[in-house]
Amino acid sequence: MGHAISSLAVALGCVFFLGGFAWGAYVYQPYTVPTDSMAPTVGAGERVLAQRIGGEDVRRGDVVVFEDPGWGDLPMLKRVVAVGGDRVECCDDQGRLSVNGRALDEPYVSGRGPASPVEFTARVPRDGLFLLGDKRDSSLDSREHLDDAHQGSVGRDTVRARVDATVWPFGSAGAVVRPEGFREMPGGVSRPGPWNAVLWTCGAGAALILAGAVYGPFARRGGRRGSP
């Protein structure tokens, strides 16, 4: 009986663990952050998981992975601060970024200075996204492309994924929080992906495998002791 319970626990554990792993691999794409332009949210060299989504699912405040030939040959990570039809400008008399006249508090921005060391105003075209790094004093982002035809915006179709969590190094691992400042704006903020569910599924599977592997020898030993 003990052997059957042990085998069942290991089998179920394998199902949960492999199923969770496959689920995560289907939903998420891992990326290594190449620069510190998104510090302190994610730093250079950190490993993140980005949920595969289409551009139509992007909301203000999302940290996205995108590819635009006009910005370079490699995928880039930036934060969406404005979407199609928005007017974005910086800075007000308190040094804050404004979207459609609404000033934003941005606790994720690195440093204590203004939201941007360079003042700017831009109108985001339809199906466009205006992107800024969280380390505003050194990030190369939409501000570097204000003279382009789309005033620094990229198309929604350039988005490949949305960053949901940091997974390496372990000391900085955790979910990327959706900014409260954008919550009351039209469209609100995006919902977190299934990161926690994937993690718990894999964890439950690993726990069942371990419990079954440990319980089996004890059950067999107990059976031998009880035999005549």
Predicted regions and their residues:
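Extended hydrophobic leader/signal-anchor segments used for secretion and membrane insertion
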Residues: 1-228
